[in-house]
């Protein structure tokens, strides 16, 4: 069976891993997934990540917990293959009144809603993380 939405699969693996208190989760690697994971690490939502394998690359995401609770409270897919959600620079969403982040795919790459607003860019809203 082919995977219809690899990003949603990645977010679900992270969500399920944290609800089961796993140390890490593994998933197939792609440039988009790598960019999103890199952004999650930079924003402090995951501890670290590793790329594994030779011909079939996999990403191992090391999950982050604080006092026994997962750092990621919610991680939700917004734009999906069947319904793409695009926002202009003036209409970029804020997550939990600025406490969370929205991950945006812009013409200059994957970035948070704050950085896109600062650069004056709009784009596709990939997901919300809080």
Curated annotation (Swiss-Prot):
GO terms for biological process: translation. One of its GO terms (molecular function) is rRNA binding. Signal peptide: none annotated. It comes from the Bacteria. Disulfide bonds: none annotated. The keyword NADP does not apply. Keywords: Ribonucleoprotein, Ribosomal protein, RNA-binding, rRNA-binding. Transmembrane segments: none annotated. InterPro entries: Ribosomal_uS8, Ribosomal_uS8_CS, Ribosomal_uS8_sf. GO terms for cellular component: ribonucleoprotein complex; ribosome. One of the primary rRNA binding proteins, it binds directly to 16S rRNA central domain where it helps coordinate assembly of the platform of the 30S subunit. Belongs to the universal ribosomal protein uS8 family. Part of the 30S ribosomal subunit. Contacts proteins S5 and S12. This is Small ribosomal subunit protein uS8. It comes from Buchnera aphidicola subsp. Schizaphis graminum (strain Sg). The lineage of its organism: Bacteria, Pseudomonadati, Pseudomonadota, Gammaproteobacteria, Enterobacterales.
């Amino acid at each position: 069976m082919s995977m219809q939405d690899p990003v949603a699969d990645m977010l679900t693996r992270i969500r399920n891993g944290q609800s089961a208190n796993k140390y890490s989760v593994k998933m197939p690697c792609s440039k988009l997934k790598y960019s999103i994971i890199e952004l999650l690490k930079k924003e402090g939502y995951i501890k670290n990540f590793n790329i594994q394998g030779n011909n079939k690359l996999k990403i191992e995401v090391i999950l982050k917990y604080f006092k026994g609770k997962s750092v990621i409270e919610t991680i939700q897919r917004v734009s999906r293959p069947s319904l793409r959600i695009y926002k202009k620079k003036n209409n970029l969403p804020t997550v939990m009144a600025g406490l969370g982040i929205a991950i945006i795919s812009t013409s200059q790459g994957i970035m948070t809603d704050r950085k896109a607003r600062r650069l004056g860019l709009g784009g596709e809203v990939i997901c919300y993380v809080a």
